[in-house]
Amino acid sequence: MTLFSNDGPLGSISSDAIKMPGTFFGYWHDLNWLGYEQPSASPGIYMALGLLLQKSVLYLKWCTPICLVILGLSAWFFFRTLGLRNLSCTIGAIAAAYNMEVVSYACWGLPSRSLTFATTFLAGAFILRALESRPWINLTIAGICVGLGLMEGYDIGALFSLYIAAFILFGFVIKPLESGKQTNLGRASGRGIAGIAVVALAAGLASSQTISTLVGTQLKGSSSGNSENTQAAKEQQWNFLTQWSLPKMEALRIVVPGLYGYRLDTPSSYDSEKLVSLEGGRYWGSMGQDPVLEQINEVEEIIAAFGQRNVLPGELAQVMNISVNQATQLMSLVQNKGRFLQRHSGSGEYVGIVVFFLAVWAILIALNKRSSLYSGTERRMILFWGFVALASLLLAFGKHAVFYQFIYQLPFFNTMRNTIKFLHPMHFALIVLCGYGVEGLIRLAKLETKESSKLIRKWIIGSSIVASIILLFSLIISSAKKVLAQHIAGQGFPLEEALTMASFAGKELIITSIFLIISVFLAAKILKTKAASPFVIGLALLVIADLTRANLPWIQYDDYKYKYNNKNPLIDQLSQSPHKGRVTISPLPSGSLGQLYGIEWLQHQFLYNNIQSIDIVQAPRMSADHEAFERRFTITGDTNTHYLAGRRWELTNTRWILGSTNDLAFFNQKFDPKKSRFTSTNSFLIGLRPDARNPNSPVYEDLTTQFNPTGPYCLIHFDGALPRAKLYSHWEVQTNDLATLEILASQEFDPHAKLIVNSQIEPSAAAPNKASGSVNITEYKPKEIQLTADATTEAILLLNDHWSPHWNVTVNGQPAELLRCNFVMRGVQLKPGQHEIVFRFQPPVTWLYVSLTSLLSGFGLLGFIVVRDRKKSTD
């Protein structure tokens, strides 16, 4: 068994393209579309674990727990640097390592998020040290920690770096106040800005390789980065970036786990073995909902007002004051409502009711100016982190509130996708406040003054009343589950299931209230008992129990042997010499085949078996050439454009199409009307595998294929697809990209007879049908393709893989010019004769060595500090 990983499944990390240590020197993903460059592996903690745990199975088993342990240790170091006692540090570390947001992301396949938290804690610790001694050395180490955070979290690391900058400035401004001196705000701010500059420089150098590869693969040439100023383009960009905004009511998930459910598939088959029943735990909120659905719901309300009769587009247009054409489009959206994403849940936001209770305690005590529990600096720090938590929550609301609009136009924020990411620093701040809260409890328990006794009595009474009210409220809500069920049913769930989900939400609310009451009881015992340590330990165990119970639904497992050792004849056939032809699914409705293809085969089996597909699993930011190519070959409502589907497959070496047996005639008639080059090879059916574990309610892993002449599905072979490599004696030079796309899409153009070259070379002088010779692929690897060619005349070798400036080519061992052909493909010019050609993916690695040097320098500085501190303590 391995831990479930949605974003890094075994199939993906087992593919040839991602093998270590090669990805440190460039990552070319060859299994989707025509291939494309992905961010190279960064020399950080996460990839170091990947290098250490070379075997994919071992990696999935151990990477997540190791990352969470690193987070806990880093948080402990941060709290110790704050000057908190060991028990406070331990509870703070537990709150960090068991935090639901961190754990849920790690169990979703993103344990690197926990490392971003860890490096931020480390950066904060060294910033605190810089305020006391050796400021420039400690700030440099803090900067390297920030750089590691950028490596681990990309835009999450960048977001945390902004908070770190604010923390540095705040720390330097309040530092002089410790001694009671009147601070010079300008001078203190200047030192803070200088500190930010040092941290930024060190972070930039440490993460230079990551920044370089991200700019080259995710931002430069990205179609989502187009700066169109039309209102429609701005609205589309806003919707794209804010789709994953936190609905305001769902902020309750921060203090009540499971109030809106957990995963979309809760309970899964593995949940039946857990101690607590998760029946009804399916997520029913609106996180990630497609913005189009808001418009659809508005139209549905208007249509409902007409009563039972059918509404004509003209009537809808009149009511909404729009054109008939727009009304027709809106009604079409309503009819296809099910195609849009209703909701998605891949993470939990529960901080822990005990953690939240302690954080609130710290803030309330800090706001009490008469209390002496915290020093002036500690009080200011608590209020700083309280402001960070509140501001981050408000920004996480994104499109659901006005706050994010104030910063949306600023650099970085106008490209950062998903405002829910602001919940990361909110959780971080609450964890810090939790540590302060525990420390405050212990300090108050040790005070033996009249004022402290009065404060303890008031606090215990107040906390007990609040906890009792919350418990009573939760019982009332639980008893009114029918009302909640009606609301859930309105979100698109059957009433019977909605009742179960409402019961689950009520149960979660009651359990959370009980944990709150227990935490109040333990806090009271800490305050009223001289021997507080046992009850502080009890509080630590309560944090573990609360967060462990809440995290259980996120912890899922895969039986990788059962999943990937599936004897599937179709997969076996496609995995033989996969570079000879790409695979896709029929664009026509294919029922269960389409679902099996999209969810199980494309995302898992194809990757595991290195099968190349023209389809893409996920590409939130599509490259500009990719987007332009796909847009030009998209079928429109005009039936005369059907041939574009066949032309797209022809140009992209898409040789295998999975579809219904009835699709063959349609393909030859519509997609290839002049040549009818689609043929059926093997018919097959989909059924249970012999060793199916869930025969009564099968999941995708339980299914396989069986070749059968009477099967409803077939593997269609497209004889017209261009080979992966081909020699051309006749080519046309065209440096205008739009003109190139028009030529390629023209029905009169024959891709087998003529090549379009988009580089500045001499036009061909050969006749159109002159023989050019032969070419063979002798070895095909993701980052190196070896070929032999026997050119009978001057020719261009076309390799039907995606062009990138980071690909190089040699002919007979000598460097040659890499040509861009057919808009997006690679090519090289050959003289007559026999040749050995090698294409290699070799992006620059200068920044990798800069990052490594910076990290080694950081270790050197850290060693210097450790040695000097030990020497100082010895003296």
Q: What kind of feature is each model-predicted range?
A:
Residues 1-72, 94-106, 110-117, 121, ...:
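Membrane-interface coil-to-helix junctions
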Residues 76-98, 134:
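Transmembrane-helix signature of polytopic, membrane-embedded enzymes
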Residues 245-250, 259-293, 484-489, 539-565, ...:
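Extracytoplasmic/lumenal acceptor-recognition loop(s) of multi-pass membrane glycoenzymes
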Residues 75-84, 124-127, 131, 363, ...:
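Transmembrane-helix signature of membrane-embedded glycosylation machinery that interfaces
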